[in-house]
């Protein structure tokens, strides 16, 4: 279940940035400006290039501007992404392993960053095209592992996210039970490495 999760990290920027179609980009920015924080449940379905369902799952999603993100897949296999504002933690309980990336490193590798990363430089890396209540976000870089993201809104709420990868797989995430974050939810964006878990530290400062 980790592949769509890693693709989500690689999509962190597509949902937080864009450009080219100036009016469409501005409209998406306006939508996202109203989503400074939220918590929701999600269901996901992944289909391959032949439209065959290859994965399904459910979990909890939360975000807070700036640069905080929480994605907890609970069914059928648990996995977790936590962006604490500085680092991104990707935890696989089954493998007892956690990978750590610099936040900006993860953003540069991806597209859902538009949700939590609002700087102009990030938006300049993407093109945005609006179609009704949906926005198609495409990276300008040809080597991006996520080739496109589509986000759809309903009544000012983020309702659906769709990610397409280089292999043609489509991941669809439907959000439900959305609500603003409470004070107690601040702990969602804090990750403590469990005892006995291997750490794959990919942060640039760790590699120096």
Curated annotation (Swiss-Prot):
PANTHER family: OUTER-MEMBRANE LIPOPROTEIN CARRIER PROTEIN (PTHR35869:SF1). The keyword Signal applies. Participates in the translocation of lipoproteins from the inner membrane to the outer membrane. Only forms a complex with a lipoprotein if the residue after the N-terminal Cys is not an aspartate (The Asp acts as a targeting signal to indicate that the lipoprotein should stay in the inner membrane). Gene3D superfamilies: Lipoprotein localisation LolA/LolB/LppX (2.50.20.10). It holds the Pfam family LolA. It is found in: Periplasm. Monomer. CDD domains: LolA. Keywords: Chaperone, Periplasm, Protein transport, Signal, Transport. Belongs to the LolA family. Residues 1-22 form the signal peptide. It comes from Shewanella loihica (strain ATCC BAA-1088 / PV-4). GO terms for biological process: lipoprotein localization to outer membrane; lipoprotein transport. GO terms for cellular component: outer membrane-bounded periplasmic space. The keyword Protein transport applies. InterPro entries: LolA/LolB/LppX, OM_lipoprot_carrier_LolA-like, OM_lipoprot_carrier_LolA_Pbac. This is Outer-membrane lipoprotein carrier protein.
């Amino acid at each position: 279940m980790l592949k769509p999760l890693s693709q989500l990290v690689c999509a962190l920027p597509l949902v937080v940035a864009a450009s080219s179609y100036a009016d469409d980009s501005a409209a998406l920015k306006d939508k996202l400006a109203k989503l400074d924080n939220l918590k929701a449940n999600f269901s996901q379905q992944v289909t391959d290039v032949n439209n065959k369902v290859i994965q399904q799952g459910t979990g909890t999603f939360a975000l807070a501007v700036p640069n905080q993100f929480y994605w907890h897949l609970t069914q059928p296999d648990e996995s977790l992404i936590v962006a604490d504002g500085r680092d991104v933690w990707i935890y696989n309980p089954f493998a007892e392993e956690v990978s750590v990336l610099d936040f900006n490193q993860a953003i540069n590798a991806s597209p859902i960053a538009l949700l939590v990363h609002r700087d102009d430089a990030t938006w300049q890396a993407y093109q945005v095209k609006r179609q009704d209540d949906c926005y198609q976000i495409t990276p300008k870089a040809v080597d991006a592992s996520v080739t496109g993201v589509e986000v759809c809104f309903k009544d000012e709420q983020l309702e659906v996210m769709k990610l397409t990868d280089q292999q043609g797989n489509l991941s669809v995430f439907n959000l439900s039970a959305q609500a603003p974050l409470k004070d107690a939810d601040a702990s969602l964006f804090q990750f403590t490495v469990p005892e006995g878990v291997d750490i794959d530290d990919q942060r640039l400062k760790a590699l120096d």
